[in-house]
Amino acid sequence: MLTIEPPSATFPASGGSSTHTITSVNESRMAFKVKSSNNEHYRVRPVYGFVEARGKMKFEIIRLEGPVKDDKIMLQYAEVPADETDAQAPFKAGAQQGDVTILLKTN
């Protein structure tokens, strides 16, 4: 399982960025994929990646200028072998095991 801190973000309508930490509470390596309900106004880095067993990593959400609207980002995850090198592969194979949602607000 993966968790995200902080679990939400608020941006000005003029745009901005927010850094979040993905934490693995598993004894296994995890791959993740980030999806957005609004690809027009949000960008994330990285979109795909790995979190080592009991590890942490940071990712960034960038909001471009746009109208005030509530959105969400979903981080899907799947357990992967230690030697997996393609973070997209488990999702192409339908191996998703769970997801975490980040609520996004603008003001």
Curated annotation (Swiss-Prot):
Q: Where is this region: Disordered?
A: 1-20
Any coiled-coil ranges, and where? none
Top-level taxon of origin: Eukaryota
Q: Which residues form the MSP domain?
A: 1-107
What does the tissue specificity note say? Expressed at higher level in testis.
Q: Which PANTHER family match?
A: MAJOR SPERM PROTEIN, MSP DOMAIN-CONTAINING PROTEIN-RELATED
Annotated protein name in UniProt: Sperm-specific class P protein 32
User: Which gene carries the instructions for this protein?
Assistant: ssp-32
